[in-house]
């Protein structure tokens, strides 16, 4: 929730306490009918979620990257979509959702984040009052994601769709625990406009409409996403592999490392420009 800081309100008005009270009501006192979550609300949200799941395929870039994670992490929580699958959502009943709700608010890990000018004691008091009815019966340990195992042979999956632009996504397991080094390496490899993927695969050779890489810190793996012409599949894959090999062999120039460090430093400094970025940073630690 976001509100105007009290310092900018006229006549000494305060919004912190009313806002935390609304949050407390939403979480601790949802609309119930005969002891269960409102069937009408559950049905409405179930329909909305199924619509979102069905429409996910329309955004091919995101869909392809999501499918890569599903295949790489099949059978793991990391491989599941954050909006679930249609069959599971369709099976949700008000009774089952109510039971899950009670379990979640009683046992799930609870973290409260505040960014603003208010004194910490005032913030703590506001949240304690707002969440005074929150039942707690012991927490459930937060399961840590396990590093992705290295495959002995590459797994290749092709899906045919009626599209004008192909999507080529590649995933790699990272065989090192030096995550800071991997962050720098990934930045040089494909995370910025100065990266090897962008400058070579996209700009120099024109094999991709876009090409970028992402480091999944929790799973210690790197994924590459690219948009290609169908006939360029093998050429693009070979060149992506060649750029990764160049990184592995230390084939880069000093300016590439300098640019990566500068990009990462600027990114860290910019976190303080946004309350939401600060929240994401701390929650991700």
How would you describe each model-predicted region?
Residues 1-139, 203-285:
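Charge-rich, well-structured scaffold segments of protease-associated domains
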């Amino acid at each position: 929730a976001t509100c105007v800081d009290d310092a900018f309100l006229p006549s000494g008005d305060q919004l912190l306490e009313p806002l935390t009270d609304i949050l407390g009501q939403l979480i601790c006192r949802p609309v119930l009918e005969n002891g269960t979550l409102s069937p009408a609300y559950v049905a409405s949200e179930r329909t909305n979620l199924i619509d979102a799941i069905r429409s996910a395929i329309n955004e091919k870039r995101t869909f392809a990257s999501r499918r890569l994670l599903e295949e790489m992490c099949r059978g793991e929580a990391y491989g599941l979509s954050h909006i679930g699958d249609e069959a599971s959502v369709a099976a949700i009943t008000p009774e089952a959702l109510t039971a899950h709700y009670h379990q979640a608010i009683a046992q799930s890990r609870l973290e409260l984040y505040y960014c603003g000018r208010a004194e910490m004691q005032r913030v703590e008091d506001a949240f304690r009052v707002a969440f005074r009815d929150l039942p707690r019966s012991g927490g459930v340990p937060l399961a840590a994601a396990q590093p992705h195992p290295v495959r002995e042979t590459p797994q290749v999956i092709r899906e045919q769709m009626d599209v004008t632009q192909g999507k080529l996504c590649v995933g790699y397991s990272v065989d090192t625990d030096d995550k800071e080094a991997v962050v720098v390496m990934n930045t040089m490899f494909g995370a910025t406009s100065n990266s090897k993927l962008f400058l070579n695969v996209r700009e120099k050779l024109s094999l991709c409409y876009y090409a970028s890489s992402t480091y999944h810190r929790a799973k210690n793996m790197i994924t590459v996403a690219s948009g290609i012409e169908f006939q360029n599949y093998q050429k693009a894959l070979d060149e992506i592999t060649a750029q990764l090999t160049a990184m592995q062999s230390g084939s880069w120039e000093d300016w590439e490392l300098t640019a990566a460090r500068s990009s990462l430093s600027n990114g860290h400094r910019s976190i303080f420009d946004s309350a939401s970025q600060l929240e994401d940073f701390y929650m991700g630690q």
